[in-house]
Amino acid sequence: TAEVLVTGRKADRNIEDAQTSVIELEMKTVKELPALLGEADIFRTLQLKPGVASAGEGNSGLYVRGGGPSQNLVLLDNATVYNPGHLLGFFSVFNADAIKSSTLIKGGIPAEYGGRISSVLDMTMREGNMKAYEFEGGIGAISSRITAQGPIIKDKAAFIVSGRFTYLSFLLNPILERQENPVSI
C-alpha cells in the first residue's frame, strides 16, 4: 500500500483592498511643491493628480472626473465645509500647516458619504504635540502663516493654533479709496 499526502497553499495576495480611485495626500508633498505666490494649497496639489482638473489659474475649485465643485463633498474632521475657497477663488480656506491627512475619493464613493456624485475630500486636523512646544511659519508674497503647538498638560492634553494673514488689504485699500464712484449706472 502507498501513502499519499496532499497539501494545499493559498496563493500570496498582494492586493488587500479593492478600493480604487483613492488619493492619499501627504502634507509633506503639499509643502514641497511650488505654490502660487508662495502659498501651499491642498486644492492646487490635488489638481495635479489624475482625474482632477481646475477651471483656470484663478479658480481653486475641484473639477473631478467632469463634475463641478458643487458635486464634491468636502469634510474637515467629519464636518461639511460648504465654501472651501476664498480670496476670489485663488486659494482654499485650509491652512496646510494645520492639516494632518487628506483623502480624495474620486469614484466608488461609500454610501456613508451619500449625496455627492463627483468626489469626497476627507481631511483630518493635526493634533497638538503633547511632549514639546513647536512653532513654525512662513512669509509669502501675499500672505504669512504661523502655527504654534504644545502640551497643556504633558502627555494628556495639547493645543494647536494655526493662522494665515494676507497683505492684500494694505495693497488694495489705497487704490479703492481713490475711486469716488467705481460703478456707473
How does the language model describe each region?
Residues 3-109, 120, 126-127:
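Periplasmic N-terminal accessory/gating domains of Gram-negative outer-membrane beta-barrel systems
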Residues 33, 131-134:
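A generic structural signal for short coil/turn motifs at secondary-structure boundaries
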Residues 73, 101-112, 118-126, 133-184:
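Predominantly transmembrane beta-strands of Gram-negative outer membrane beta-barrel pores used
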